[in-house]
UniProtKB/Swiss-Prot annotation:
A zinc finger (NR C4-type) spans 146-166, 182-206. Residues 261-495 form the NR LBD domain. Keywords: Activator, DNA-binding, Lipid-binding, Metal-binding, Nucleus, Phosphoprotein, Receptor, Steroid-binding, Transcription, Transcription regulation, Zinc, Zinc-finger. Residues 1-145 are annotated as: Modulating. This is Estrogen receptor beta. The lineage of its organism: Eukaryota, Metazoa, Chordata, Craniata, Vertebrata. The gene is ESR2. The keyword Transcription regulation applies. Signal peptide: none annotated. Phosphorylation at Ser-84 and Ser-102 recruits NCOA1.
Amino acid sequence: MDVKNSPSSLNSPVSYNCGQSILPLEPGPIYLPSSYVESRHEYSAVTFYSPAVMNYSIPNNSEDGPGRQTTSPNVLWPTPGHLSPLAIHCQSSLLYAEPQKSPWCETRSLEHTFPVNRETLKRKASGSSCASPVSSPSSKRDAHFCAVCSDYASGYHYGVWSCEGCKAFFKRSIQGHNDYICPATNQCTIDKNRRKSCQACRLRKCYEVGMVKCGSRRERCGYRIVRRQRNSDEQLHCLSKTKRNGAPMTRVKELLLSALSPEQLVLTLLEAEPPHVLMSRPSAPFTEASMMMSLTKLADKELVHMISWAKKIPGFVELSLYDQVRLLESCWLEVLMVGLMWRSIDHPGKLIFAPDLVLDRDEGKCVEGILEIFDMLLATTSRFRELKLQHKEYLCVKAMILLNSSMYPSATASQEADSGRKLTHLLNAVTDALVWVIAKSGMSSQQQSMRLANLLMLLSHVRHASNKGMEHLLNMKCKNVVPVYDLLLEMLNAHTLRSNKPLVTRSERNLAEDSESKEGSQKPQAQ
């Protein structure tokens, strides 16, 4: 028997009696009300619906899925032979741009399409709701724990469940002196037994778990919660109204992106992280050919994962295919290098290209010209290590490198303006997420500004190392030291074409200026 969710519009259940049936029950799928499916309680009696009773036609199962129709424009695309490998990789993302629809599927709330914070995930996983402050003290299942030190929570204080000790500590910190300094590395463990050992790390963790000044009383912040819910409902109403009126979908998708909070965006970037690529280390000693073969194979594998990572960034697949390819071609080596720096940040003097491919600086001497690039990578990694770069900061910085790599104009002026507006919107969202991550560290406003500036200034060093690496790869390709295939070859060819275009344009402009100057000098002589 095929059991499915009933449409949400069926609000009047018709009881079914096995002994005496008023209406004949035709054979077909049986639809189970969603209230029974989604509830966690067990019911002794369940009401069933038949499509024939409710005058609904059964979808034809001979088609591809029950009542499912794809709106994918895949049939309109040219064959892969007319597109580059990178365009084919990016083009597949459009298959998932529009969700599949079915006449028997319920309309999900928009909030389920966005990532939620860890506290919400914990509550959903445990099956208990923390939305209500009323809990039974007699049952340990309903007991809440302090989000800071994991002790038993006394209530909902400053926006989170916390104990009396952490509540009082946070109150003293926000009302008085809070310029605490960690005697260690700002990574102290804060738990029930060691929460008093370091005030700086305790305050930092208070901010990390979400403590805010306005959350001192749940009732006092009630109007903020209601107002936030009202704004969310109004935004959803505007989105549905915009869709009904046939407004451009780009505006709707921009509103969806703006609905993401910085925390949700960071969690999305965390989920989008590509997996580690394993490479077998060649037998020692290294030669120029063996090392370059290992590095180019690794880069080609990482490029495939990098395209998948880019498509998971909120709003990236909403860009045109041309813009997606242009951004990836402009920054692919920078993204790979900043990932290399993050893997090597805890290993001074070493470059962790892969978990099984670790190179020392001196091992680069076997390849002509690569030792200078190794030194640049190690120097920038050392600077990130001095700043104690955090993982969430690294996620935001890597996304900023991708979205800030647009250096070439679009085909037309209108396309240039539209793509510039979309990219600016995406870049602002990622920048807000980076600012939010730095603010959660508990530093003063001046220290936060300095840290943001230091992180952004290091991006120029990453770009410089990328330019050197690109030049070295092109030289190795021209000398036929190592064969280059697939996506890596496509990226190198795109870089060659783009770097030659400005030179041709500049030479043509110089020739035009010379001809104009000659004509201007000949006219007075003729007179």
